[in-house]
A protein has these predicted regions:
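Juxtamembrane interface elements at the cytosolic ends of transmembrane helices
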Residues: 2, 35-39, 43, 183-193, ...
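Hydrophobic, membrane-embedded alpha-helices of multi-pass small-molecule transporters
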Residues: 18-35, 172-184, 202, 215-217, ...
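Membrane-embedded alpha-helical modules
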Residues: 103-220, 330, 335-455
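Membrane-embedded helical hairpins/re-entrant loop segments and their flanking transmembrane helices
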Residues: 12, 17, 43-85, 251-323
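Alpha-helical scaffold segments
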Residues: 470-545
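Short, non-helical or kinked segments that cap or interrupt transmembrane helices
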Residues: 59-60, 81-95, 135-144, 198-204, ...
Length: 545
């Protein structure tokens, strides 16, 4: 009798190329606007400070797409202990934007890349044990940090919206503001009236329509297109060998932890969508791939990489579970990274158009933070954590503007940052609202939400304390659903201790699992069972017997 070969898992299936190719392009389009935003932001800041030339932004865009493709292939295909082998797209994270600009302004571009390389190495080293540390980053902390990232980036969007120029002469002109709002209205219209497939790329379409409309008004400038070849190569260490400075590295190590927390959520989410169990080792493989992609990014003059959440949503919508869709998308990104003229087109998009799209894009980042915070029980303690963290982050936006008549022949306008009298190392870490807010949120959560068990039992904020793992909403729904099979409930009880109080009250949970949960000695579980026994005259503990 012939032995039947095991069925191929859906995540490993290789559909025909004619099906993979359009799906891969769909993933690229869904992430493209977010992927190129970071090199435009950081590159623009470095050009304004005289650290880079305008033409260097083309190289940053090429390098960003090229390494994003490599990192995506590593994550989807995998080798040895690198890659979660799921349909995950990799792109540059917004979390590092503020710290990198601060590092570049204070220490130069090469120090950015030295810090990025150190950040990636740190992520690879931390990957095997990060699952044990994630309890220190509950939704209260991660949601606050993501909200701060979105709010901090809005300043960049405002500069673009006004058509920010080096001289500031035309800044805030009615034409620029009008074009910014036009682009924003186009994005809103697409979200309201377009089919689902187009809504997934609403920001990219808004950029396209806004740019086309801006051309007759003379806002688009592609006069330099002839300076670039059709095909080019990304050069490692193009701006010089990386420099390593301690405070700059510390600033990005804080970002690294935020990146790993974000990627963990994406890996767990996509694992649920494609019905793949995420073991601690598999999670470590995915985080290690994030770190490797970040190291490669530092070598090729780009930035830290993370899984892109918008593509996780696309996997759920399309229902295509094969990881090779991401593989094809990664190859497409690598090819786009070899096209200088394509990067030059992006670099030439009018700033007001970028501003309109940026308001939507960065606002969506902030809204993602609000969505994460919706899982939090807002006691006075947790409100205080969020409020102070955002407040400390926004302090970095404070500037003193005055006219100094002693610096030259005439009056000179001067601006001073809040921390301008502090040492360079302090400014590098705390000048960015993102890193300052992240440090504050982590420390306040540890200080205010770490209390004895008896206090937590009476506090609605108990589930946000750092003693618990970051809960996944899909797992929580399964834990409470009476239709969930008993075997799945037992598996959840073993894998997700923070869900045991839910599982023990699920009528579908068999008596053996309930007994096992109670034997683990969790005081919260015991308190729940006692309460139900009081209500049911003892029938709760003997059900199913």
């Amino acid at each position: 009798m012939a032995v039947q070969a095991p069925a191929e898992r859906p995540v490993d299936e290789i559909p025909p190329l004619k099906r993979l190719l359009p799906l891969g392009f769909q993933h690229v389009l869904a992430m493209y606007a977010g992927a190129v935003a970071v090199p435009l932001i950081v590159g623009g800041a470095m050009v304004g400070a005289g650290r880079l030339q305008q033409s260097d932004i083309v190289h940053l865009i090429m390098a960003d797409l090229f390494v994003a493709g490599i990192a995506t292939v590593i994550q989807a295909v995998g080798f040895w202990r690198f890659g979660v082998r799921l349909p995950l797209m990799q792109g540059v994270t917004f979390a590092a934007v503020g710290p990198m600009i601060t590092i570049g302004l204070n220490h130069g571009v090469t120090t950015i890349y030295g810090s990025v390389i150190a950040c990636g190495l740190f992520m690879m080293a931390l990957a095997p044990v990060f699952g044990k540390l994630i309890r220190f980053f509950p939704p209260l902390v991660t949601g606050t940090i993501i909200l701060i990232i979105g709010v901090s980036l809005m300043r960049v969007a405002a500069g673009w919206f006004g058509g920010g120029t080096a001289t500031g002469v035309d800044f805030g002109s009615p034409a620029a503001i009008g074009m910014g709002f036009f682009t924003l209205v186009v994005i809103i219209a697409i979200e309201r009236f377009a089919p689902e497939g187009l809504r997934r790329v609403s920001i990219l379409l808004g950029l396209l329509v806004g740019t086309v409309v801006a051309i007759p008004f003379g806002m688009a400038d592609w006069s330099h297109m002839g300076d670039y070849d059709w095909v080019g190569f990304v050069t490692p260490f193009q701006f010089g060998m990386p420099a390593f400075e301690v405070s700059s590295i510390i600033a990005l190590l804080i970002v690294a932890i935020v990146i790993m927390t974000e990627t963990t959520g994406d890996i767990v989410a996509v694992g649920e969508i494609v019905d793949e169990k995420i073991t601690p080792q598999r999670l470590a493989d995915g985080l290690r791939a994030d770190g490797l992609g970040t190291v490669i990014g530092g070598i090729f003059n780009t930035f830290p990489y993370t899984a892109f959440a918008q593509n996780v949503g696309l996997v759920a919508i399309t229902g295509v579970r094969t990881r090779h869709v991401a593989t094809v998308a990664g190859v497409i990104l690598v090819l786009l990274g070899l096209l200088p003229k394509m990067a030059a087109v992006v670099e030439g998009i009018p700033l007001p158009v970028l501003g309109g799209a940026g308001v939507a894009l960065f606002g969506m980042v902030a809204a993602s933070g609000v969505r994460t915070l919706s899982k939090v029980a807002f006691t006075n303690t947790n409100i205080l954590v969020v409020a102070i963290s955002i407040g400390v982050a926004m302090l970095t936006e404070a500037k003193l503007y005055y006219t100094d008549r002693t610096l030259g022949d005439g009056p000179v306008n001067v601006s001073l940052d809040l921390y301008h009298q502090f040492p360079d190392w302090f400014q590098t870490i705390f000048h960015s609202g993102i890193s300052a807010g992240a440090i504050t949120a982590i420390l306040l959560n540890l200080l205010l939400n770490t209390r004895p068990t008896d206090e937590l039992a009476g506090d609605l904020a108990g589930h946000d304390a750092p003693r618990g793992a970051l809960p996944d909403p899909l797992d929580a729904l399964r834990a409470a659903d009476p239709a969930t099979p008993p075997q799945r409930l037992r598996q959840l009880a073993e894998d997700r201790p923070e869900l045991r109080t839910i599982i023990v009250t699920n009528p579908a949970t068999d008596r053996e699992t309930c007994t096992w949960i109670r034997e683990q000695g969790d005081e919260q579980v015991a308190a729940v069972c006692r309460k139900w026994d009081e209500v049911t005259d003892g029938r709760f503990s003997t059900r199913g017997g």
